[in-house]
Amino acid sequence: MGPGMVGGYGVAPTAPAGTSVRMAGSRFEPATITTAPGQIVRWFNDDTAAHTVSASDGTWDSGNLPPGASFERRFDVPGTFPYVCVYHPGMAGTVLVTAP
């Protein structure tokens, strides 16, 4: 593995500290996360129900995430990226990507 690469044989990739969002109690924790361009945000379903992580504008979607599943997405450009769980009205979050 070279510098900056994530993962390895038999090892699940992990997001850098501060770029993880937990799904529990039918909410995203934290509801808003701030990161830099090029970073990966990881969502982990720590709930007893399935969820999705779906861009509010429809441009990306995790698909069904059963309990224990996770989803990762890299954000390359600065901006505000709201998302929702399509199964649970009111379950929403935002990724803020700020220039360094």
Spell out what each predicted region is.
Residues 54-59:
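Short amphipathic beta-strand segments in non-cytosolic proteins
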Residues 31-49, 71-77, 82-83:
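Beta-strand cores of secreted/periplasmic/IMS beta-sandwich domains, seen most often
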Residues 1-7, 65-100:
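Extracellular/periplasmic metallocenter environments
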Residues 1-20:
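Extracellular/periplasmic low-complexity linear segments
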Residues 19, 51-52, 93-94:
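Extracytoplasmic/periplasmic beta-strand context in beta-sandwich domains
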Residues 26, 44, 86-87:
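Short, surface-exposed helix/turn micro-motifs that flank interaction/cofactor sites
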Residues 14-37:
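N-terminal edge beta-strand
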